[in-house]
Amino acid sequence: MNKTTRVMPAHKHIALVAHDNYKPELLRWVKENKDALQGHFLYATGTTGRILSKETGLAIKSLLSGPMGGDQQLGALISEGKIDMMIFFWDPLNAVPHDPDVKALLRIATVWNVPVAMNRASAKFMISAPQMAEEVSIEIPDYDAYLAERV
């Protein structure tokens, strides 16, 4: 597939997602990194967003709850180039009813070259990277070329 680039702005659009058993862990991480997150635009699936906003005071755009379509909403935002990175504390030991949606979300993040942190260690590396405060060019699929080849 042909590639093109898009520029992530200095003020990133960051998705925050956590399965039920990992919501307290994500909340703890967000509290620890509140100062670093304040300069960015934050999005979250429903329940997670409400908890994080209530407990931290951060402005967070809450989508639907994951099982009710929030994961798919987030995937659509990624496809539209509106999400720059994702922190997703998912539960590797327990299946969730919307596992196909979770897999689709991770797949679409990979397709569009969106950085994803899936645990505290990778989230720490991501949030502390110097590029967090800079514009960053990333390679993405050239959808126009893809469409032209297929039509």
From Swiss-Prot:
GO terms for cellular component: cytosol. One of its GO terms (molecular function) is methylglyoxal synthase activity. Residues 6-151 form the MGS-like domain. The keyword Lyase applies. It is an enzyme of class 4 (lyase). The keyword Lyase applies. It catalyses: dihydroxyacetone phosphate = methylglyoxal + phosphate. Transmembrane segments: none annotated. Keywords: Lyase. It comes from the Bacteria. Its EC number is 4.2.3.3. PROSITE patterns: METHYLGLYOXAL_SYNTH, MGS. One of its GO terms (biological process) is methylglyoxal biosynthetic process. The active site is at residue 71. Gene3D superfamilies: Methylglyoxal synthase-like domain. Pfam families: MGS (PF02142). Substrate binds at residues 19, 23, 45-48, 65-66, 98. PANTHER family: METHYLGLYOXAL SYNTHASE. HAMAP family: Methylglyoxal_synth (MF_00549). Belongs to the methylglyoxal synthase family. Catalyzes the formation of methylglyoxal from dihydroxyacetone phosphate. This is Methylglyoxal synthase. It comes from Aliivibrio fischeri (strain MJ11) (Vibrio fischeri).
